[in-house]
Amino acid sequence: MNLGSLVSESRNPQTMDLDALSTFDLVTRFNQQDTLVALAVKETLPEVAKAVDAATDALKSGGRIIYMGAGTSGRLGVLDASECPPTFGVPHGLVLGLIAGGPGALLKAVEGAEDNQQLGADDLIAIHLTANDLVVGLAASGRTPYVIGGLEYAKQLGCTTVAISCNPVSPIAQVAAIAISPVVGPEALTGSTRLKSGTAQKLVLNMISTGAMVKFGKVYQNLMVDMQATNIKLVDRACRMVVQATGASREEAEAALKQTDHDVKPAILMILSGLDAAAARAKLDAHQGFLRAALEN
């Protein structure tokens, strides 16, 4: 592949004079480029929706969501995965991020790791990948060997696969069952795909993980009702969520949360249904943790 022919590696005619601009004009130029990102992502929404449904299916079948990438792409996957346990109360590892070169590559590049196709497969073997898992490969260029190797192994195992890249008709898009390719155009700084490409990938990951968790019963209305209240800020947020969902007073919300060990979902059900904590938990269990279903049935 001629790397210079990739959109993500080409020069941007709107930013040829970066080194001659005033500071304000410099940041304005970057901002102008960033406005293109959401529009590019919008064009991929049908594929993003398919990825959300695939992620939901994986979770409901007892599988995991696995992100894998190199460099910025890998770091973004690790970031999104690491936010899921505190936000949605899911176990660590249910959403997992793999980066070429291992955890050390989060802080310092591991030379050659992204060019090792077998390493992608080996990393998935090491986490005992199963056919129930969803594997999402991230590569701005769309041709990272580490990601291709991982996607090919996952495909052989029977996993549903997703590719997220910022070049059209990329190699990883051709390997994966679902291809999400927001074409954001040349970067403001030539080839620096941590910029628009990274932003586009983050927007897509936001939708995949959050959308899947909504459809997995971790959200009521637009409230993260399975959030873990692990610090003062989150304890306060838990109380506010109960108030917002029920219309109860803060005192009533605090009393309910005290009985549920600050577990928001049963506290809401207690107030709206008149159940005690044990009965609220039992009813939630009977409805697979879906608060709306527990309230309506």
From Swiss-Prot:
Pathway: Amino-sugar metabolism; 1,6-anhydro-N-acetylmuramate degradation; Amino-sugar metabolism; N-acetylmuramate degradation; Cell wall biogenesis; peptidoglycan recycling. Pfam families: GKRP-like_C, GKRP_SIS_N. Induction: Induced by MurNAc 6-phosphate that releases the repressor MurR from the DNA. Repressed by MurR in the absence of MurNAc 6-phosphate. Keywords: Carbohydrate metabolism, Lyase. It comes from the Bacteria. It catalyses: N-acetyl-D-muramate 6-phosphate + H2O = N-acetyl-D-glucosamine 6-phosphate + (R)-lactate. Its EC number is 4.2.1.126. InterPro entries: Etherase_MurQ, Glucokinase_regulatory_CS, MURQ/GCKR, SIS_dom, SIS_dom_sf, UBA-like_sf. The active site is at 83 (proton donor), 114. Residues 55-218 form the SIS domain. One of its GO terms (molecular function) is carbohydrate derivative binding. GO terms for biological process: 1,6-anhydro-N-acetyl-beta-muramic acid catabolic process; amino sugar catabolic process; N-acetylmuramic acid catabolic process; peptidoglycan turnover. It is an enzyme of class 4 (lyase). Specifically catalyzes the cleavage of the D-lactyl ether substituent of MurNAc 6-phosphate, producing GlcNAc 6-phosphate and D-lactate. Together with AnmK, is also required for the utilization of anhydro-N-acetylmuramic acid (anhMurNAc) either imported from the medium or derived from its own cell wall murein, and thus plays a role in cell wall recycling. Belongs to the GCKR-like family. MurNAc-6-P etherase subfamily. Homodimer. A lyase-type mechanism (elimination/hydration) is suggested for the cleavage of the lactyl ether bond of MurNAc 6-phosphate, with the formation of an alpha,beta-unsaturated aldehyde intermediate with (E)-stereochemistry, followed by the syn addition of water to give product. This is N-acetylmuramic acid 6-phosphate etherase. The lineage of its organism: Bacteria, Pseudomonadati, Pseudomonadota, Gammaproteobacteria, Enterobacterales. The gene is murQ.
